[in-house]
Amino acid sequence: MSEVTTAEFNEEGKYLRKIRSFVLREGRLTKGQAQAIESQWPTMGLDYSPVPLNLSEVFGREADTVLEIGFGMGASLVQMAKDAPEQNFIGIEVHKPGVGSCLSDAAIAGVTNLRVYHHDAMEVLEHAIADGSLARVQLFFPDPWHKKRHHKRRIVQAEFAELVRRKLKIGGVFHMATDWEEYSEHMLEVMNAAPGYKNQSADGTVVPRPDHRPLTKFEARGHRLGHGVWDLMFERIA
């Protein structure tokens, strides 16, 4: 378990350093995950460098690019890439078994429009992604840090909202989802106060799950048990 705190920014909102908003649980790789990393990383893996990516070179084309922070085991990200071959997808995940699982699923699905980082998302966003380059940023089911004294560790804070805004194109969307209602309220408070965004909800709250976000098995089970999931979508307007 690693030390966990929040990111820090200077007065201009530039990322300075981070103490992670996640707990590192590395876990053991299965044979299949290890094989997928070995075989698929040369084509789908992105090695971190503090230089902005040239997306047209990375994907070999000009297309809208979607970036997902913390894709877990990657099943929904692979499904999204398969369902939208006209878009480019980049996933960031710190847990190596998740990276291996994602690459394995992507190879089986035959997707060619997906690239993956095994690195800290804050560093990737600040240094490896050009400003104004993304059509959508996705943050699905981040750690809610339930205890009040841990709320400062939540990734959705004012400074993070500004970092995401800088990376989005005008008209690009920051899409969040959580199964913890209190965290959805926190997200809503942060995002409604964040300059340069417009809530895509007609009533200024949450939105129905959009078709582009697959329903996960965990989520479907939660629905059957009466558990809620809250989606928030904010468009960059300035």
From Swiss-Prot:
Matching InterPro entries:
SAM-dependent_MTases_sf, tRNA_(Gua-N-7)_MeTrfase_Trmb, tRNA_methyltr_TrmB_bact
What pathway annotation does it carry?
tRNA modification; N(7)-methylguanine-tRNA biosynthesis
Q: Which domain of life is it from?
A: Bacteria
Q: What start-end ranges are recorded for coiled-coil regions in this protein?
A: none
Any GO MF annotation of the entry: tRNA (guanine(46)-N7)-methyltransferase activity
UniProt keywords, alphabetically: Methyltransferase, S-adenosyl-L-methionine, Transferase, tRNA processing
The protein's annotated catalytic reaction(s) are: guanosine(46) in tRNA + S-adenosyl-L-methionine = N(7)-methylguanosine(46) in tRNA + S-adenosyl-L-homocysteine
Residues reported in the UniProt entry to bind S-adenosyl-L-methionine: E68, E93, D120, D143
Instruction: Answer whether the UniProt record assigns the keyword S-adenosyl-L-methionine to this protein.
Output: yes
Active site at which residues? D143
Gene3D superfamilies named in the record? Vaccinia Virus protein VP39
Q: Where does substrate bind?
A: K147, D179, T216, K217, F218, E219
Q: List the GO terms this entry assigns under cellular component, sorted alphabetically.
A: tRNA methyltransferase complex
**What EC number(s) does its UniProt record assign?**
2.1.1.33
EC category: transferase
Membership in a protein family = Belongs to the class I-like SAM-binding methyltransferase superfamily. TrmB family.
Q: What does this protein do?
A: Catalyzes the formation of N(7)-methylguanine at position 46 (m7G46) in tRNA.
**UniProt-recorded name of the protein:** tRNA (guanine-N(7)-)-methyltransferase
- Species of provenance: Shewanella putrefaciens (strain CN-32 / ATCC BAA-453)
Corresponding gene?
Answer: trmB
